[in-house]
């Protein structure tokens, strides 16, 4: 399947490891345009584009940014969630390996819109290569006067599933362990105090990477592909019992069957596909819903879930009891145990 790559580099393009190389592809045009606009107009551009968060919930980005923008609090922050702990998902790390500049640019645009005091990028401390790439991008943009020194900071975090939960991520940003807070980021943000709640935008790597391109090329360009429910493209990680595991950037609205068979080449062995999971907490997906268009609303309506678009495939040779044991063991180990269903096993 041949589709336009928007944030995932084409196979014939080398990784972008310098700011000059990024600019040669049109990089930094997004932030230049954003800064020539009023902050509310930038939000309107994202609203027109229909960008939804690519981290799992699919929440409209424009609504999230509007909440922070309209809040009268004098101190606000932007946080990028780059922890990526969902089994079967690798796309954010891949983006940071190949082109960290689009993330830094997107984060800087978000910071401009809400007049953020600082930007924090949360990455697992073990992501050594990705941390080095992002820091290099930050340093080059500082040298080029695109962002101020120390304005965007990397926050290394633990190798824990909970680090990817946005309220737990904020705890790590504040120097504590990865245990989720009760209040959401717009009511209890980074560096909060009893008198200052510091509303905070939290977006993941893929979401912020899209922002830089939307501002550079416009909402109509973004909506030219994808579906009404979920415009644009999304990166799908495909692994397990398929011939061609990997990462595929596809228009939303592409069917699950096309992802599995046209991109992934179908089952790797002689057994048909038995089950597909889009994350360990989502329900099992079987043949009956393979023709469902990939999108947040369409997958939910079909009884499945899009999640962060990491798909694990099992063929008929796999024992589903074994899979259930693996998934439940992972969730039991990873749970924070703060709410009743996980604490009591209800």
Region annotations inferred by a language model:
Residues 99-113:
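Histidine-anchored nucleotide/phosphate-binding helix
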Residues 29-45, 74-76, 82, 91-96, ...:
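Ferredoxin-type iron-sulfur electron-transfer modules in oxidoreductases and energy-metabolism complexes
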Residues 1-49, 112, 116-121, 232, ...:
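Iron-sulfur (Fe-S) cluster-binding modules
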Residues 22-28, 80-92, 191-194, 237-242:
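Gly-rich Lys/Arg/Thr-decorated short loops/hinges at beta-loop-alpha junctions or inter-strand turns
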Residues 64, 119, 264-280:
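Short loop-to-beta-strand transition segments
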Residues 34-76:
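N-terminal glycine-rich phosphate/pyrophosphate-binding loops that anchor nucleotide-derived ligands
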Residues 48-62, 161-163, 274-283, 304, ...:
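Local cysteine-cluster metal-coordination motifs and their immediate loop/turn environment
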Residues 131-252, 264:
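Hydrophobic alpha-helical positions that pack around
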């Amino acid at each position: 399947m041949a589709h336009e790559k928007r944030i995932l580099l084409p196979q014939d393009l080398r990784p972008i490891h310098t700011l000059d190389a990024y600019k040669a592809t049109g990089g930094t045009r997004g932030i230049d345009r954003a800064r020539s606009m009023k902050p509310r107009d930038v939000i309107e551009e994202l609203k027109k584009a229909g960008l939804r968060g690519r981290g799992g919930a699919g929440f409209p980005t424009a609504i999230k940014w509007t909440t922070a923008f309209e809040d009268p609090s004098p101190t606000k922050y932007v946080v990028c969630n780059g922890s990526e702990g969902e089994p079967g998902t690798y796309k954010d790390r891949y983006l940071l390996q190949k082109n960290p500049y689009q993330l830094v640019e997107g984060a800087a645009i978000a910071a401009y819109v809400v007049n953020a005091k600082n930007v924090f990028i949360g990455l697992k401390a073990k992501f050594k290569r990705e941390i080095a790439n992002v820091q290099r991008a930050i340093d080059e943009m500082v040298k080029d006067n695109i962002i101020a020194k120390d304005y965007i900071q990397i926050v290394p975090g633990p190798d824990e599933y909970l680090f990817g939960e946005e309220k737990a991520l904020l705890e790590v940003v504040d120097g504590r362990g990865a245990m989720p807070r009760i209040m959401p980021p717009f009511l209890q943000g980074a560096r909060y105090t009893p008198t200052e709640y510091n509303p905070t935008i939290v977006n993941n790597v893929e979401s912020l990477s899209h922002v830089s391109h939307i501002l550079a090329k416009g909402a109509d360009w973004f909506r030219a592909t994808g579906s009404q429910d979920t415009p644009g493209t999304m990166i799908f990680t495909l692994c397990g019992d398929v011939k061609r595991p990997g990462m595929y950037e596809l228009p939303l609205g592409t069917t699950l069957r096309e992802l599995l068979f046209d991109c992934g080449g179908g089952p790797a062995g002689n057994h048909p596909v038995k089950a597909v999971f889009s994350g360990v907490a989502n329900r099992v997906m079987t043949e009956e819903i393979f023709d469902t268009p990939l999108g947040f609303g369409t997958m939910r309506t079909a009884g499945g879930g899009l999640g962060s678009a990491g798909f694990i495939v099992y063929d008929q040779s796999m024992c589903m009891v074994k899979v259930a044991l693996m998934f439940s063991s992972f969730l039991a180990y990873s749970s924070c145990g703060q709410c009743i269903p996980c604490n009591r096993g209800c």
